[in-house]
């Protein structure tokens, strides 16, 4: 009994000690990695000094109380995502770390210009390959790479959407290297997701740190995104009515991103529909309502190409609408993103984006790509096979971090299996060196610790462009991990664009 009492007393003292501890930036150590908050032990980078000082003023117990408040807010607000598994679909509460990421506004302004430049060039490229194909004739990009892409849609040949824009919504994944410079890791053009979580992260952060939003920082707002998205969609409406009928087409409640579909429809004031809610008559799309059929002008579709129209693509699809593709071809309805836009989502095509920017815009890329190796090229493929244990290998058309190999963390068996896959289908693989991703602090159980992050800003394009101030910061919650995807254990943070001063 005495021993148990003594143990309990020691545990109580330890808990009280941890609870009253404060963040000690002198002992915070990101090792060889570039940390975005702390430049050297005890010293915060200029834009983050206010945040670092504020966190230092709180005890660890007070920080944990704020974390509990954030968790409760997420639960109350119903912010969730779905994970698919063999055991069934599991709804999970959104993983959120309360310590925000800080980016200086001058740095972000340059990054924003780079993202707009990139999407302009990508849209020129998509419009060209489905029409004149000048880039093939000028031998800038090999035609066989495009025509062999799993996302190339021959059915889209000869089509020219309004403004020549195919990808109206893009989510590009950015990383910072060991020098703190942004690089584009990949472009998501098919059905980019995550923007609702960016918006909800901000709502939660305001609840947790209201005093920082009121006094300390001039943080750029992000709340205008739904309005900007609606304006982008309205701009591509075939009919010039003052209030175009915009709908969000969802696969349904069992889709992993259904929360986002519902969220965006509600915030835009648009109808959330499934394929069964729509019908095509005389090459026009109508929505079924209690008052009869209502013509639809714009469909923000959150369904992959192959499922949007069973009469053209996957004949077994029950998610889309028969006749929808032809209605789009005839110009009677706009689709965002347009069918076929995903051809530029191909990770093999990604390697050509710098050349694509130079070709169509006659500009040097503002944002660089990560060095990449194409397995379809024999010489580069040999390099990849000889250095598999040092590289990250990605399949051309997977997303969410699935199907990839992180060489330095792979077993001998995994390396051998990937070598076999690459040799069997070299067109389907590309490789990149393992970048020393930057770190930011997260709130651990006992101390503040560094973790790796990436960033997904969202870019809109129609008659004009828009970039979210910041984006969805994804963080690897496990020490040493590079996996930031929420479906694989990653978390998220609010992203603050703040003054450099």
Show which residues each predicted segment covers.
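Preference for protein termini
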Residues: 1-501
